[in-house]
Curated annotation (Swiss-Prot):
Top-rank lineage group of the source organism: Bacteria
Induction cue: Induced by L-ascorbate. Repressed by UlaR.
A Pfam short name: Lactamase_B_2
InterPro entries noted in UniProt: L-ascorbate_6P_UlaG, Metallo-B-lactamas, RibonucZ/Hydroxyglut_hydro, UlaG-like_MBL-fold, UPF0173_UPF0282_UlaG_hydrolase
Biological processes, Gene Ontology terms: L-ascorbic acid catabolic process
Record has Isomerase as a keyword: no
Family to which the UniProt record says this protein belongs: Belongs to the UlaG family.
GO MF annotation: an example: L-ascorbate 6-phosphate lactonase activity
Protein name, per record: Probable L-ascorbate-6-phosphate lactonase UlaG
Lineage: Bacteria, Pseudomonadati, Pseudomonadota, Gammaproteobacteria, Enterobacterales
Compartments, record wording: Cytoplasm
Length: 354
């Protein structure tokens, strides 16, 4: 059989997916986090891998799914939260635009799996399956009640799950995880299709969503999940020391308010008294595409007048950020390589060839 006859769609997918293979898995495993620091990697959407100086590994909102893949059904799912929000009927054209940079089935060293809320792009059955199959049998799954309900429904033993609500603290080796109030109003209208939201007082946010503060020996990270802007960020900033804050940013389509704007991101950072603010979530959905440079431009306009005590950082999916080593950087660039140029003799026809 010739090569072109032996290749199938399935063999093509297996040979190219996930796009980064186990490259990032290996990088994270090999990373030695220096004392007085923490390292984290952006996994796409609001997915984060955090590693402490003690070698503790936790992942938050790691999602391995996709968005729309076909024009087959031109209508939005009845009762979808975006339909409730804006009274729309047409299919939302939210295609995933970010590659898969971490292979869940290549994860071996992990100390906790966390989710901020139960929306499909923040909690993943494949991650749960991979951790259950390949990692230690005592790795906890930590999240609000709705997330735990999902994990248990997928087959994660109930005793492996920890339900958290605002005010709860969970210790995972040298990382202290504080569950804080979430401000994700979209979560409150994510309801069964036959349930009406109009004229009904929503149930509590605390069972649906939480924000997290990760206190490590080398610094503190605030993860806001899908939270919108809230005045309560200032309360969190009053009560906790926050070094780096992550906020869900995006260009909201007409009639929709689901992501923070550039102004919201700056207000969040100011309220939290953070040192660095990093936007995320803008990478993932084609119809929420946004330019994070807008945040930096607005920051430049306001920073001297308002005396901002923070800086924005523009990240790339799969990239690493180390606190405090990267605190004065404004943008991430992937490693460029070729740092060992001319360690061996070039093989060129003549010296001035290039």
């Amino acid at each position: 059989m010739s090569k072109v006859q032996s290749i199938t769609r399935e063999s093509w997918i297996l040979s190219t997916f996930p796009e980064w293979g186990s490259w990032l898995n290996e990088e994270i495993e090999q990373e030695q986090v220096a004392p007085g620091t923490f390292a984290m990697w952006w996994l796409g959407c609001t997915g984060i891998w955090l590693k402490s100086e003690g070698g503790t590994n936790v992942c938050v909102d790691f999602w391995c799914g996709t968005g729309k893949q076909s024009h087959g059904n031109p209508l939005m799912k009845t009762g979808h939260q975006m339909q409730r929000m804006a009274g729309v009927k047409k299919l939302q054209p939210n295609l995933r635009t970010t590659p898969f940079v971490l292979d869940p089935f290549a994860i071996r060293q992990i100390d906790a799996v966390l989710a901020t809320h139960d929306h499909n792009d923040h909690i993943d059955v494949n991650v749960a399956a991979a951790v259950m199959q390949n990692c230690a049998d005592n790795v906890p799954f930590i999240g609000p009640q709705t997330c735990v309900d999902l994990w248990v429904g997928w087959g994660v033993p109930k005793e492996r799950c920890i339900v958290v609500k605002p005010g709860d603290v969970v210790k995972v080796k040298d990382i202290e995880i504080h569950a804080l109030d979430a401000f994700d109003r979209t979560a409150l209208i994510t309801l069964p299709a036959d349930q009406k939201a109009a004229g009904v007082l929503p149930d509590g946010m605390d069972v649906r969503a939480v924000n997290y503060l990760f206190k490590t020996p080398g610094g503190n990270l605030y993860h806001s999940g899908d939270s919108h802007y809230s005045n309560y960020y200032a309360k969190h900033g009053n009560e906790h020391q926050i070094d780096v804050a992550l906020g869900s940013y995006g260009e909201n389509p007409r009639g929709i308010t689901d992501k923070m704007t550039s102004a919201d991101i700056l207000r969040m950072a100011e309220s939290l008294n953070t040192k660095v603010v990093i936007p995320f979530h803008h990478d993932i959905w084609s119809n929420f595409q946004a330019d994070p440079q807008e945040i930096r431009v607005l920051w430049e306009m306001k920073k001297d007048r308002l005396k901002y005590g923070f800086k924005p950082f523009i990240w790339q999916v799969g990239g690493k950020f180390t606190w405090p080593l990267d605190k004065d950087n404004f943008e991430y660039h992937y490693p460029r390589g070729f740092d060992d140029c001319f360690t061996i003799e070039p093989d060129l026809p003549f010296k001035s060839f290039l």
